[in-house]
């Protein structure tokens, strides 16, 4: 899940203590009616932003029908699967690239307060998926790398390369991740759960294979 993917690239670890007293991160699920929930995927409070810092709230009614069935796939790699990773990343201290930080940290290079958060990709066109899962330039990023519409595949399964750099700057690296000889196999088709992965690998003799493609 999202916790494991974040912990795999940096020294931040998530432990279930069995209670909610002074937790660093809390995850809530809530439901809104159709009118209220339109466009609301979830939200989170970054450290230092609010007395509820570390809270992750997911609007379950965006993803699930009244009978419990899912409206769209929430599999890792799907468009809706991004929400869980993105909100947990906010609770861990990451911001949107188009926003300034609480301590006036700058926006992504090439973006200003006049930038369109859903369209402008900044320097080198990297304020977009799959370089960062915190960008609002997601579906239809016009870079040929992600689907043009909501799909069950084609989006990030892990923090993007820029997200990994930020997490490691804040928390330090995970020095033990993928330390052996690893093989990374490229998927052969676009189907539910197929998505982008940014590799953080700390050792061994590794290879990327497209065998069977």
Role assignments for model-derived ranges:
Residues 1-213:
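RTX-like calcium-binding, glycine/aspartate-rich low-complexity repeat tracts
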């Amino acid at each position: 899940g999202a916790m494991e993917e974040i912990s795999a690239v940096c020294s931040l670890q998530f432990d279930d203590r069995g209670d909610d007293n002074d937790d660093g991160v809390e995850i809530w699920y809530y439901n809104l009616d159709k009118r209220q929930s339109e466009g609301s995927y979830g939200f989170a409070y970054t450290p230092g932003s609010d007395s509820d810092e570390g809270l992750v709230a997911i609007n379950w009614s965006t993803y699930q029908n009244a009978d419990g069935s899912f409206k769209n796939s929430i599999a890792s790699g799907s468009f809706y699967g991004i929400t869980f990773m993105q909100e947990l990343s906010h609770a861990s201290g990451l911001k949107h690239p188009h926003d300034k930080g609480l301590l006036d940290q700058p926006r992504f290079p090439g973006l200003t307060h006049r930038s369109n958060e859903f369209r402008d990709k900044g320097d080198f066109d990297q304020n977009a998926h799959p370089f960062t899962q915190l960008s609002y330039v997601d579906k239809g990023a016009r870079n040929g790398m992600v689907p043009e519409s909501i799909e069950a595949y084609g989006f990030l399964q892990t923090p993007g390369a820029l997200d990994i750099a930020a997490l490691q700057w804040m928390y330090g690296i995970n020095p033990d991740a993928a330390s052996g000889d690893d093989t990374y196999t490229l998927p052969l088709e676009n189907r539910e759960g197929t998505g982008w992965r940014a590799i953080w690998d700390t050792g061994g003799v590794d290879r990327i294979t497209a065998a069977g493609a």
